[in-house]
Structures are given as structure tokens and as C-alpha cells.
Amino acid sequence: MPERRTVALVTLGCARNEVDSEELAGRLEADGWQLVEDAEDADVAVVNTCGFVEAAKKDSVDALLEANDLKGHGRTQAVVAVGCMAERYGKELAEALPEADGVLGFDDYTNISDRLQTILNGGIHAAHTPRDRRKLLPISPAERQSAGADVALPGHGAPEGLPEDLPEGLAPESGPRAPLRRRLDGSPVASVKLASGCDRRCSFCAIPSFRGSFISRRPSDVLGETRWLAEQGVKEVMLVSENNTSYGKDLGDIRLLETLLPELAEVDGIERVRVSYLQPAEMRPGLIDVLTSTPKIAPYFDLSFQHSAPDVLRAMRRFGDTDRFLELLDTIRSKAPQAGVRSNFIVGFPGETEADLAELERFLTGARLDAIGVFGYSDEEGTEAATYGHKLDEDVVAARLARVSRLAEELVAQRAEERVGETVHVLVESIDDEEGAVGRAEHQAPETDGQVLFTSGEGLTVGRMVEAKVVGTEGVDLVAEPLPGSLVCTEEAGR
């Protein structure tokens, strides 16, 4: 009988990383590894790192060091780094952090079981030398689908040579290109990867260099994975990628998302479909119409504004201004008055003036956003912005970050108060003795946004869609009272 091998996956960063972790979990379980929840109970602790900004990289290093500490007094024998930080730095990370017994890039994912076994046996798998993954796919989007078969794209394709009899609950059951995937929690919400990579050239962002050029998954693959997730009890799927508004451009149809969304909404068992990561400059009337008028599609707009002062946006290699952004929001709300909108912003960008900051504050005040993320600028190596002059002192960036963060906190609390009296459709996500029943309405995405606190959990169950009336707020969170007969009909859920 083969020796029992255990592995734990520790996931940091965004929802895309969560999908990648479930792919790794699926590959490992298919090859006989036993998944455990806690790293201290695992032979190998795999840390799926984030390489987005400095704070995220620090969190990733801390998680690796914490896992390494387990080797002295527990079952853990090896610690392995995967994910964006591992891909971005490769050999450099391995040399700087000897506590990690292995640093694996995206090209290692299809052979993750063999890689971990080698490391567990005391062997060494040489870390890769990082390369610009944008160069792995053709410049022309039309040529990428055929070339993509030879490029590692986490979350896109099934590995070769899988055993015919996969363990129960392990994808794919719904098509040859659905990714091998094992859910790591019992949440009624799951992310589905719509695409990978990004063709935008924002001057502050390094993500395209290690995630590559934009490439869409085929609609049949996305539908197949969504059906499988519904069979696992998922009620809400959130479509993720670096830029969902570009979906289909490499498949010959830039409006493919408008066609796909109604099909996803018709999947049996799915109560809500949410779209994240939308670019304001790529929004189009047809997409707004589908997002605001299709049953079971959340009227939710995760718009990447980043700033609103024209000079700063130009330096960021982005487009728009305060008035155009406000006009976009007016268009959305004219079609769906209760639509949810969230965005992230960078303050202290090189060359940002007090007038620029005031313009951003004007936009934030007028935008009535439901959730706001604010980040202070810091150089990211390999980016155009890192070469800019006119850098602001760190204390100036910190002061502006604190100033805009305070304003953002006030504004999202005000926006929550505006929702008092509204009727919302809430997916119940957890029920416990301490917090009671908690869920999320259409305008609230997992992790990043607020939530709904029910006044009573009586009769509620996790995964149930409930109609409730907002009766109060706690900061950005809503307090809501379930309405009598509040099980929402699936045809109405999401509207």
C-alpha cells in the first residue's frame, strides 16, 4: 500500500489565486495526495503567493516563514512556494529565501505531484529563471488560441494522462478542457476563471509580465466548469480574470461576454452570476444592458478607475477623467438604480499634484461607490512608472493615502446608509452562534466588499437566496430583516 502523503495549500492574494489553488489541489488528489486543511498536519505546505504589490509580497514571505517554523515541531517536512511571486522571481526568490524547499513556477503546475514528491524525498528542483510571459503568445490575439496549447495557463486546460477514474467531487466531469479542480471549502460561492493575462500596458503594473498576454477560455469550458460547480452545491459564480471586458477578442468576438452571461444564468442550480475586473475604457452599451437587465446576473460593476485626474491617468497609460467616469456611472444607474459599484485607486503617483488629488476627491464624492480600495503608490520593478521622475516623498504618499482612505471610509458608509429601506436579495453564506446569519447582496462581492447581517437567522440555511429589507447599517455592512416567505424564486434572483 503506497505511503500516505499529505499536503496543505495556503492561498494568498486574489480570487484568481484561489482558482489556481483548487486546480493544484485537484491535480494532487488525482495523483493520490491527501489534502488537509492545516499546514501543521501536512507533509508538504504549499504557499500560493501573491506578487502584486510590496505589502502582498511581504505577506507571502511571512506565510512561507511561518510554514517553515512548523518543520521544527510538527509533521511538516517541506515548504514550497507557488503562485505569482514564485513565478515572478523564481531563482531570485529561492536564493533569497532558503527556508522555502522549492520555488515552482506556472510551468511546473502540470507536474506538481512529481515536483512535490522530489522535494519531499530530499531532492532539489531547480527554480526557474523568470521570463516575460507576454512573449510566449503571439502579438495578434487571433493567433493565441492555437499557440496557447503549448503555454502553461493555470485554470485553462486539463492535464494529460489523468487516471480514468477520478475521485468523487473532482473535475472535470463536464468536458475535456475543463480544469482539474478540487474545491477547498464548502462555500456556496466560487470563482471561475474567464481568461488569463492582460494586454493593457498600465505603467504601474507588473502583472502582464508574469501572467502573460490576454487569452480567453472557450465558452464551452466556462459553462462546463460552472455546471460542475453547481453539482457541488455552488449557488453563485464570480467570473475572474485580469480584464473581463476583453473576453472573446481572441475568439473573434469582443462581445462574447454578452452572449455567455445569459447562458451561465440558465445553468441549473446557479442563483447568481457576478462579473469582476471591468475596465472603464472598454465598457460598452450592450454589456451594460446585459449586466443590468438579465435575470440572475448581478448588476455589479467592479470598475478599475485607479484615478480620475487626466494628467495622472495619462501617466498611468490609462484613459478617462472625472466627468466621463461619472457619466458612465449615471448610465449604469439609469438602467439599474440599485446597481453596485466598487473600484480601487492609487494615490501618490509620480507627479500627482494637490490639484490632481482634489480632482480624485471630487470624483469619489460624486461617484457614490459601494466599496473603495485605496493604495499608496510604490515602485514595482520592471514597470515604466518605476523609471519616472517627480517621485513624491514617502511621507507625502502616506499622508495622501491616509487622507483619501478616511474620505473613502466616510463615503462608503454614507452609501450604505442610502440603501436603508431597499429590498435586497441576499445569498446566505454563513450561520454561527457568534455572528448569526451573514450573507451578501447583489452589490457585495466576496472578500473585498461589505456584507449583510441578518436581524434573525431563524429558518435560514447556508446557500439559500433570501429577500430582505435593509433596516440599518454598521459601517459598510447592511443590517437586514428577512421578509416573510423570503425564499427568492430562481427566476427573480439577481434582479
Swiss-Prot record:
Its main location: cytoplasm. SUPFAM superfamilies: Radical SAM enzymes. Residues 5-121 form the MTTase N-terminal domain. [4Fe-4S] cluster 2 binds at C198, C202, C205. CDD domains: Radical_SAM. Residues 417-484 form the TRAM domain. [4Fe-4S] cluster 1 binds at C14, C50, C84. This is Ribosomal protein uS12 methylthiotransferase RimO.
